[in-house]
Amino acid sequence: MSRYVFTSESVTEGHPDKICDQVSDAVLDALLAQDPASRVACETVVNTGLCIITGEVTTTARVDFNTLVRGVIADIGYSSAKAGGFDANSCAVLVALDQQSPDIAQGVDEADDHAGDPLDKVGAGDQGIMFGYACDETPELMPLPISLAHRLARRLAEVRHNGTLGYLLPDGKTQVSVVYEDDQPVAIDTILISTQHIAEIDGISDEKGLRERISADLWTHVVEPATADLSLKPSKDTTKYLVNPTGKFVVGGPQGDAGLTGRKIIVDTYGGYARHGGGAFSGKDPTKVDRSAAYAARFVAKALVAAGLARKAEVQLSYAIGVAKPVSILVESFGTSSHSNDELTELVNANFDLRPGAIIENFKLRNLPQQRGGNFYREVAAYGHFGRSDLNLPWEDVSVIAAKLKG
């Protein structure tokens, strides 16, 4: 019997890097809502009292970026002096956006291999490799460690926003270690939560007292509710439980650490449980295959698992800039399928159109911000892009294709 512990982490919406992801995707949403053909590559930097948005944009949309950025920061919770020193009302906002390079645009506008089919005219926005993954460890077909870490992070933000734990501040991280036996999760080994908080809670200001108070509150209001519906639950007797191990966490957010778009790519995907091609998602329009093809790869992998063709599936896609058809498609089932990897790959080639134009069209990736009131990509910029049962994401809905594959 093999036995090991696997660990994944998540971060809250107030983490400096996640602020940047949300700002970049809010910019993307705003531009696509007005002009669905917008080309966007928006990067964000935050530091003490400063937010910079930069990158390349080609669009007919007109957006007040200053107001947009401040609104995102305020919604996260950085909107007063008590929010840890970073304030949407007083921070400097610098905008440095340029146009997309015409050399890149020409390959995306008219693919090198098009031959009559309109979907062949959309070339990949860059070269690269993308991975998608699914497994049967959770109802949403995600690995359990990252699923639990996201649950805790979302709940941490929820009890802050609704006032249940009003002393919490926006910055925070979660980490979950799961025990596996023969590749099946059997126990929760460790839960770690680091959360920013005010300096004094109900008269308690010493480090030991703060940790004890926060630890007890988080178990009651975060850990237990976040795991209540799971068959595998943490136990006070057997699960190691760590809260703010350094003692206190008062200075946080951009006041404590600089943040950048695209620095939480493992949090965004599978928590390290599957491979990653290296490309970030946020701030990129759908012609960037770093984003759209990663969504498609997840769709394929999830469909294979949902159809019962494998218990685990990892899909690798690769693209060349300006070329519509994938350079390669590979499926790995890790010995959990009655079919060979070659057979599964052939099945994918026969049933999925993985050209960028087809991915964009099938998932309506250019139109979703407009259809959802100007707020779509920002929703997935925190707490993961996959396995989101709280959001209606087209790449997560595999019911139709899974039924077809079963037949």
Swiss-Prot record:
User: Known Pfam families for this protein?
Assistant: S-AdoMet_synt_C, S-AdoMet_synt_M, S-AdoMet_synt_N
Keyword terms: ATP-binding, Cytoplasm, Magnesium, Metal-binding, Nucleotide-binding, One-carbon metabolism, Potassium, Transferase
Tell me its cofactors. Answer: Mg(2+); K(+)
Any one of the GO CC terms: cytoplasm
Q: How is the cofactor bound?
A: Binds 2 divalent ions per subunit. Binds 1 potassium ion per subunit.
Q: Please give the positions of the paired cysteines in each disulfide bond.
A: none
Subcellular location, in the record's words?
Cytoplasm
Catalytic reaction list: L-methionine + ATP + H2O = S-adenosyl-L-methionine + phosphate + diphosphate
The entry's Mg(2+)-binding residues are D17
Q: In which pathway does it act?
A: Amino-acid biosynthesis; S-adenosyl-L-methionine biosynthesis; S-adenosyl-L-methionine from L-methionine: step 1/1
Binding residues annotated for ATP, in chain numbering: H15, D171, G172, K173, K248, F249, D257, R263, K264, A280, K284
* Alphabetized HAMAP family for the sequence: S_AdoMet_synth1
**What function does the entry list?**
Catalyzes the formation of S-adenosylmethionine (AdoMet) from methionine and ATP. The overall synthetic reaction is composed of two sequential steps, AdoMet formation and the subsequent tripolyphosphate hydrolysis which occurs prior to release of AdoMet from the enzyme.
Its assembly, as annotated, is:
Homotetramer; dimer of dimers.
NCBIfam families given for it? Answer: metK
Give the family from UniProt.
Belongs to the AdoMet synthase family.
* Protein name listed in UniProt: S-adenosylmethionine synthase
User: Which organism was this protein described from?
Assistant: Synechococcus sp. (strain RCC307)
Q: Which gene encodes it?
A: metK
